């Protein structure tokens, strides 16, 4: 039987993008399955580089997660200036030059996000006033959106020349390792802790001079993340070979008074008491949380007035403390965490009942703060639907009458 005259072959009806769409879905699913835990620990290295010389001013490595590995970075202003700077007579080649650099203010402008009119690398992204977001100057430059803040460290202004302690006696005032006496402290802002650091970020730094051109240098900040080792699947603990269910309370039997043996009978050896039942795996985890509570209650008793102790069930295992506050996402603690309510009386095993009780109290408090009109809408869904169903045609009818009146 012949097909319709205008039917296309089957291969023409297949979407050519179909395989790519399926491949993208599979890749996305694979990425979601392999998503790292927020508690995963990495070897994080932060590196500050002088882009004018290519030298590293600071390289700090630490172990931490992707959300908390934001340390303070310490380096020297001379690591960014170099021996000679921008044909201005400034530089850090001599102790006197290093001392003179300490007398100038400086300001920093971002190169990762350059506002209009702030120029390029030649101007250090500081083409006009107002581009600076941080620094150490009398007008106190600051920003609410930049990723870092850069300030001077704690060095006395009246310190003498910055002698190199390896070249002269360390007893000389102002002698430091390498002649470094212009310490800087780089800190991450809240925006910087939330930003993506997949690539390097660039900033320009300029010394403020009352006359002449302010000299320019540029530096970059990069983050390198390395796994601390292969993630080996974790199975049952070989030390704990008796993975038992939670132990049940044993009924205590009152001891019977001993009866004297009949005359002429041999002495009876008393039977040994049966060994006590070992605690199960659940009891051991509860004891772990209870031990954490006791340690917390002894060290920080103010934190245990009203809190939750949570044990993350997925490796690596962590214990945390959550102080009660204004939180609305109550289901987030039910993913991979086992939480127990605690106060000064101790750990509450029946935590879900406590949670339901507190949720009920909060719901009643919320309902008591509502007005009668809002409460009517929340309680009567059919009334809400009826109101909106009637309001629509009424508005249209009123508009028709209004236009009819205006044109008549």
From Swiss-Prot:
Subcellular location as annotated: Host endoplasmic reticulum membrane; Host cell membrane; Virion membrane
Region annotation Disordered: where it falls in the sequence: 256-281
Functional note: Envelope-like membrane glycoprotein.
Intravirion side: 407-408
Coiled coil: 335-371
Virion surface-side segments: 33-385
Gene designation per UniProt: env
Other known facts: Compared to other gammaretroviruses which possess 2 envelope proteins (gp70 and p15E), RSFFV gp55 corresponds to a gp70-p15E fusion protein with a deletion of a portion of p15E. It is encoded by the defective env gene of the virus.
PANTHER family for the chain: BC035947 PROTEIN-RELATED (PTHR10424:SF72), VIRAL ENVELOPE PROTEIN (PTHR10424)
Name listed for the protein in its UniProt record: Glycoprotein 55
One cellular component (GO) term of this entry: host cell plasma membrane
GO biological process: fusion of virus membrane with host plasma membrane; symbiont entry into host cell; virion attachment to host cell
Keywords: Coiled coil, Fusion of virus membrane with host cell membrane, Fusion of virus membrane with host membrane, Glycoprotein, Host cell membrane, Host endoplasmic reticulum, Host membrane, Host-virus interaction, Membrane, Signal, Transmembrane, Transmembrane helix, Viral attachment to host cell, Viral envelope protein, Viral penetration into host cytoplasm, Virion, Virus entry into host cell
Signal peptide, first to last residue: 1-32
This protein's record includes keyword Ubl conjugation: no
InterPro entries cross-referenced by the UniProt entry: FMuLV_rcpt-bd, TLV/ENV_coat_polyprotein
Membrane topology: Single-pass type I membrane protein
Entry-listed glycosylation sites: 43, 58, 297, 329, 378
Superkingdom of origin: Viruses
Chain ranges passing through the membrane: 386-406
Gene3D superfamilies in alphabetical order: 1.10.287.210, ENV polyprotein, receptor-binding domain (3.90.310.10)
Disulfide topology: none
Keyword set includes Coiled coil: yes
